[in-house]
């Protein structure tokens, strides 16, 4: 772990919403008197009927979580209507097309009309409060309209990432018993066209075989390509939009009414439908957005996440819009038409706050600095990372090269299940360490425990748990509360178990070490894959690395590393040996790499996450049953990895 501490920039500290003293006072109050603290901060959103009950939560036995349970509000009203008087003509949403020469700017007044018309189309087709509406759309403004329209009328949306296969869509339709789906004819990403409507048609057929019948399909035109059409079921959004009225009263929603279901992508088994409700989620998403990103009115905020993930829900749509922010949505790829696209968008729209994934950072770092240096990036004030731990080398590149050593990096740790940030720096309150998520957000009581559940004090490494509820927490798994209890609360009684490992250093900074199932057991010694990956990436020749375990006849598990080299660097026996020595030097001899496979590319989803389950199977020579790889951005990469695997002799 890096021990250098990066101070808070003077200009950030001077103007920040939260300074070090405020953080300490608020955090102490949030732990000692959570009812009073969250009762006060619940007022940040508007309520049609104020709450009198703040917190009613227990992690014991059957687990029950309720916040603001007698309050009445509406998420879309808070994200749009309440801003119209003062911000109606200000930009709510900037949309940057896949095409570098095309964009749109939508004001809050325009957003209101779009969402109301969308909501009325849904109502005209019989959608009502409590109905589940599936959304399978690319990153286009209509995706945000669809979410907000559902929230406006009380329908429960289930957004399905537009990179998912027909089988994955069908599984979500079946679990949610959804009979209405919103999709587009196609999606555009880089030089690719993805047939969304075809995927939906196949998914509907699969779902019908399980007695779930989708009766209505709204189609948004993104291209002019011909698509299969079912009369009486399918209808065009653009044909109904002009006839829908531009006003739609917001449904009065109880704070604990469901807002959305979002399915976690497990590698095996039935998908888990994480259920978030209305009041507490919006309080937490908006509060974390405001304070973690130190958001000031008028700033341009860009979260690169897809709306199919929780980050897109909380920090592209709901959090920013609830705060009256200008939020940027990007349809395309960070490498199209070349690796300078992100930085060109930053300059074009004068982005102040930029929030992206470590995988994207590492990939762009590997392309070289020239793509960054041809842009100005002078508008940037804050940088953020999300989705996985960021290794110190990538953190430093992001800080020094992209941020010109002046923009604090907000290394945020949280989950689909948490609704919002859990461990995170605050720009005006937190000195930084490269690769550390730093400290808990308000109201978050974290504990490190050993496998037996013993609480670890001081400098320690263990399993990360949270011992009390917070407003943004998931309430259950849709239609499967028993699985919810077993998955998150049965391992350590009375605690929410995150499934992640974590280190706490001597300064009480927290470092996420990766999923517990990403812990390798090498000759009885536990090693986190994230730690080994960080060591590899710290070598100047390495752009990206992914480490997995594989069966080893002596050690139990061996260390198998997939390595992508910097542009212009060629694999060699010398480099192979240098990397082994480098990791031994960084971590110790126990971390000796058993296999190194040089790979031009790693298998990633369209959201940029490395699909490690595929790498595990290749490393174990179990590649005959890789499962669904249709969610990969480039499925053909897998064939190259299999052909060049390094453990053929073990299999023989």
Curated annotation (Swiss-Prot):
Keyword list, A-Z? Acetylation, ATP-binding, Ligase, Magnesium, Metal-binding, Nucleotide-binding
**Broad enzyme group:** ligase
Binding residues for Mg(2+): 539, 542
Q: Name one GO molecular function term.
A: ATP binding
* Residues modified as N6-acetyllysine: 609
- Which E.C. number(s) belong to this protein? 6.2.1.1
Q: State whether keyword Transcription applies.
A: no
Q: Which cofactor does it need?
A: Mg(2+)
Query: One biological-process term from Gene Ontology?
Result: acetyl-CoA biosynthetic process from acetate
Pfam families noted in UniProt: ACAS_N (PF16177), AMP-binding (PF00501), AMP-binding_C (PF13193)
Q: Which cellular components does GO assign to this protein?
A: cytosol
Q: Superkingdom of this entry's organism?
A: Bacteria
Post-translational modification, as annotated = Acetylated. Deacetylation by the SIR2-homolog deacetylase activates the enzyme.
Please indicate if the UniProt record lists Ligase as a keyword. Answer: yes
Question: Which reactions does this protein catalyse?
Answer: acetate + ATP + CoA = acetyl-CoA + AMP + diphosphate
User: Which residues make up the binding site for ATP?
Assistant: 387-389, 411-416, 500, 515, 526
Described purpose of this protein according to its UniProt entry: Catalyzes the conversion of acetate into acetyl-CoA (AcCoA), an essential intermediate at the junction of anabolic and catabolic pathways. AcsA undergoes a two-step reaction. In the first half reaction, AcsA combines acetate with ATP to form acetyl-adenylate (AcAMP) intermediate. In the second half reaction, it can then transfer the acetyl group from AcAMP to the sulfhydryl group of CoA, forming the product AcCoA.
Q: Which family does it belong to?
A: Belongs to the ATP-dependent AMP-binding enzyme family.
Protein name per UniProt: Acetyl-coenzyme A synthetase
UniProt organism field: Bartonella bacilliformis (strain ATCC 35685 / KC583 / Herrer 020/F12,63)
């Amino acid at each position: 772990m890096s021990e250098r501490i990066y101070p808070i920039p003077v200009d950030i500290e001077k103007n920040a919403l939260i300074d070090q003293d405020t953080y300490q006072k608020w955090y102490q109050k949030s732990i000692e008197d959570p009812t009073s603290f969250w009762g006060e901060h619940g007022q940040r959103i508007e309520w049609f009927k104020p709450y009198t009950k703040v917190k009613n939560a227990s992690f014991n036995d059957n687990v029950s979580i309720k916040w603001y349970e007698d309050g009445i509000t509406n998420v879309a009203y808070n994200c749009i209507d309440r801003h119209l008087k003062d911000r109606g003509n200000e930009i709510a949403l900037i949309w940057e097309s896949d095409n570098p020469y095309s964009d749109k700017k939508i004001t809050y007044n325009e957003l209101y009309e779009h969402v109301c018309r969308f909501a009325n189309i849904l109502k005209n087709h019989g959608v009502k409060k409590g109905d589940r509406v599936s959304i399978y759309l690319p990153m286009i403004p209509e995706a945000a309209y669809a979410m907000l329209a559902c929230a406006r009328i009380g329908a429960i949306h289930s957004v399905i990432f537009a990179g998912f296969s027909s089988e994955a869509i069908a599984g979500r339709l079946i679990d949610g018993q959804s009979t209405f789906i919103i999709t587009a004819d196609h999606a555009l990403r880089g030089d690719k066209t993805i047939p969304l409507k075809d995927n939906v048609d196949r998914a509907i057929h699969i779902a019908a075989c399980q007695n779930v019948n989708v009766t209505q399909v709204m189609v948004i035109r993104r291209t002019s390509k011909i698509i299969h059409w079912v009369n009486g079921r399918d209808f065009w959004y653009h044909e109904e939009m002009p006839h829908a009225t531009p006003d739609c009263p917001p449904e009065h929603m109880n704070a604990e009414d469901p807002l959305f279901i979002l399915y976690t992508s497990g590698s095996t088994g039935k998908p888990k439908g994480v259920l978030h409700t209305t009041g507490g989620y919006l309080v937490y998403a908006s509060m974390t957005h405001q304070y973690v990103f130190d958001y000031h009115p008028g700033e341009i905020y860009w979260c690169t996440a897809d709306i199919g993930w929780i980050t897109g829900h909380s920090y592209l749509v709901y959090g920013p819009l609830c705060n009256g922010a200008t939020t940027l949505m990007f349809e395309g790829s960070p490498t199209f038409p070349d690796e300078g696209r992100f930085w060109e968008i930053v300059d074009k729209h004068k982005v102040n706050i930029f929030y992206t994934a470590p995988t994207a950072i590492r990939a762009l770092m590997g392309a070289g600095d020239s793509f960054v240096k041809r842009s100005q990036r002078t508008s940037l004030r804050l940088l953020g990372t999300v989705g996985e731990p960021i290794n110190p080398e990538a953190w430093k590149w992001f800080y020094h090269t992209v941020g010109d050593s002046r923009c604090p990096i907000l290394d945020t740790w949280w989950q689909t299940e948490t609704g919002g940030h859990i461990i995170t720096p605050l720009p005006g309150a937190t000195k930084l360490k490269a690769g550390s998520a730093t400290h808990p957000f308000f109201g978050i009581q974290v504990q490190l425990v050993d496998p037996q559940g013993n609480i670890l004090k001081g400098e320690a490494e263990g399993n990360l748990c949270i011992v009390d509820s917070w407003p943004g927490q998931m309430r259950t798994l849709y239609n499967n509360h028993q699985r919810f209890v077993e998955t998150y609360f049965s391992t350590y009684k009375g605690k929410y178990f995150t499934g992640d490992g974590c280190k706490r250093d001597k300064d009480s900074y927290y470092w996420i070490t990766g999923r517990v199932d990403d812990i390798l057991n090498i000759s009885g010694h536990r090693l986190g894959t994230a730690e080994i990956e960080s060591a590899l990436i710290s070598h100047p020749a390495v752009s990206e690395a992914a480490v997995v375990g594989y069966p080893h006849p002596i050690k139990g598990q061996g260390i198998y590393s997939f390595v992508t080299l910097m542009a212009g660097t060629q694999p060699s026996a010398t480099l192979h040996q240098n990397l082994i020595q480098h990791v031994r030097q960084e971590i110790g001899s126990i971390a000796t790499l058993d296999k190194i496979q040089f790979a031009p590319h790693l298998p990633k989803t369209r959201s940029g996450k490395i699909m490690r389950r595929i790498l595990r199977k290749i490393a174990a020579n179990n590649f005959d049953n890789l499962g669904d790889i249709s969610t990969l951005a480039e499925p053909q990469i897998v064939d190259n990895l299999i052909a060049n695997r390094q453990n053929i002799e073990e299999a023989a």
